[in-house]
Amino acid sequence: SYNTKNFIDGQGTIRGVKNGFVLESDQNNSGLAIYVDNAAAVVDHCWFRGAWFDPQTVVWDNIRYGRIADKRPVKGVAPGASVYVPLTLQPGETKTVKVNFCWYLPDSNLSIGGARKVGQAFTGMPCKGTASGQQPVSGFVGKQLLNSFDRGGDGLTGIIQSPEFNIGKRYLKFLVGGGSQADRTSVNLVVDGKIVETAVGNQTETLSETVWDLKPYQGKKAFVKVIDLDVYPWGHILADQFVLTDNRNEDIYNLSSTSTLLADFESNSWGDWQVVDSSEEEKQFLADEGDVEATYRPWYSERFKSLNEVIGYWDANQAMLEKNSRLFSDAFYSSSLPAEVLEAVAANLTILKSPTVLRQWDGRFWAWEGCQDSFGSCHGSCTHVWNYAQALPHLFPSLERTLRETEFRVSQNTEGHQNFRVNLPISAPPHNFHAAADGQLGGIMKVYREWRISGDTQWMKDLFPAVKKSLDYCIRTWDPLHKGYLEEPHHNTYDIEFWGPDGMCTSFYLGALTAFIEMGKELKQPVKEYTALLSKGKKYMETALFDGEYFIQKIQWEGLQAPNPVDVMSFGGSYSEEALKLLKEEGPKYQYGTGCLSDGILGMWMASVCGLDEVLDNEKVRSHLVAVHKYNLKHDLIDHFNPQRPVYACGKDGGLLLCTWPKGGMLSLPFVYSNEVWTGIEYQVASHLMMKGEVEKGLDIVRECRERYDGRVRNPFNEIECGHWYARAMASYGMLQGLTGVRYDAVDKTMYIDSKIGDFKSFISTDTGFGTIEWKAGKPVLNVVYGNIDVKRYNVSGKIVD
């Protein structure tokens, strides 16, 4: 038997389908169909209706005593359903009953940045801290605060204001956090009908103190106006503890008797604060956003019009779909590559079948970084995380190309700034935060990769103007003096900004310049300026940033075009009195300086997996990777101190630390996450080591990683970072190329092979087909099992073989 609660819709019905049942949603002809391939099936369409555990108790009795309940569908809510298949088996006989699942829910309430619920941000009552789906909120006083994220996330908008008060004290102090746009998410002081003071958050959920000097407004009447007119990421505002005082140093958490508390939001209502009509003020933003669907609709909602169509398609095509799936599986597992590598690659392909990935109605791909238990983790196909993921561009190249199209046509503005996260449904995001240096520069390399994988030069040509604008923005923003390296503060995958040149992001810069030059040459575009930058950057990387063993960071925060770090917007980058002291002694928070960073040459790995030559000295790159293995790989972590997220690897676990300081120089506050272990970084280092001929060192890292995910403590098919099925883990796919050097170039029809393990047999997937590739007794052997792969020549370790 197969038995299930009615989990689709608590108020939905259960109806019949041939040899099974449908958990029906409240929408017409949609839901989940569950049915078997046996005509003898008997269906209980409605479990016992009762309270508490009554339904489960009765159905379990039926199961354990072998009773078959035959019950027709009922009107109204049904708590669950069962399908039974009576069987008679002789001793030693087996029979298989296939259970089919067909899912069709064409609509959702999921949106990030696109849907707008006008005037609903401040309904109900003040928030009791952190709202559902929100990062932890801290820094407020008492048990409640004003939090416009509370009742629906960033999609809610509204305005709330205080009663009018007389300005008789010198200062107004309060706490603020959340979004940072003065015209969209802010706390404002209104005097004589005009906004005279404004405070915003710093794109962090930690509230910080703001002080307004009221001397110019003494004797006048005023009110506080809090606005949330933004539906994009960080489209919310946090505020708490509004206090009038004559003491600028008033302790806002322990008020004196001479202060006046204007609002603390500790009651079960807004009290005398009033929600006001925001519709007029929102018109300008509504006009800017254009016509975008309010909520996400999946791709299949356009292909199929009903659940019955899905069932019909599955019944007609399941044999073909299973056959092709087995072709893939058989080809993949026929490989002779090390077992730990195959396991790491295969296990992480589950990410592509997890809730981490979505495909909207028009076919465009969109993804979270990972998944929390009940919602997505970190939205928007984040460029600096999906940089690492190498499975999708090879297995489903056309889907990967939609990511590039979104990045350069939707997420990029006219200045070339890319938001590294995009809305859902896909639409133009705001440009109210830093671009991500590694994400934006990595995207340029990935345009080159998608061109070589697809062979579609016209596609590359169409994107090239936007790619140029993107690269020019990067140069103008992070290398304004054209030195060839990133000097100005640059945001990256560690959710912070590196100040001064570093190996990780400057290697991305060199890789992006290389990709742009190659594409420019193909299109006969001028690239002289970029070639000069590449030459200067290469020289600087190999000298100033190489300490003789590995690449480092030169921390710099003075003499830049950027303002003081205290004044620069940053996640969690606010500077307390203690942090200001550290700034003077060590420089900005969250740097790595002389550390040995596992990602310290990441841009060169990206270049290789994108089909580009690594422009840096090969021996220096190899030296860096060997140093990472030497210093950062730990075979147990008993003595390792990790104040961040130790659950990724702890105790007797082994793993590759993100950074160590073997030669001293560790900062008091190094970059966040530096003590952690991330599987995606383990795999990129391992595959890069393999490319450099250091196969055993690479396998050493892979073994430590997969031993943590052996099923005893952690799920072998769910490598976690900031969420389950975390996309960065698909860096594991790069190990196929790392061991074999196998890469197909569809532009010039060349199959590349550069084996680091002698003879081998490996899986190969291209835009037009998949199969296996062998290097055997000095000869390449290609076996295409699906589609076709048009190979004109082989390039074997740099030598052409027709």
Can you say where each PLM-predicted feature lies in the sequence?
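Trp/Gly-enriched beta-strand surface patches
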Residues: 2-91, 283
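Aromatic-rich carbohydrate-recognition surfaces in CAZymes
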Residues: 3-10, 16, 22-25, 89, ...
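Short beta-strands within extracellular/lumenal beta-sheet-rich domains
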Residues: 83-85, 143-168, 207-211
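Short Pro-Gly-centered flexible turn/kink motifs
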Residues: 87-103, 287
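Extracellular carbohydrate-recognition regions
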Residues: 114-128, 244-286
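Extracellular carbohydrate recognition and processing domains
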Residues: 190-237
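Extended glycan-interaction surfaces of carbohydrate-active proteins
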Residues: 201, 338-374, 398-431, 477-501, ...
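Non-catalytic C-terminal accessory modules of carbohydrate-active enzymes
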Residues: 648-654, 668-671, 675-676, 682-802
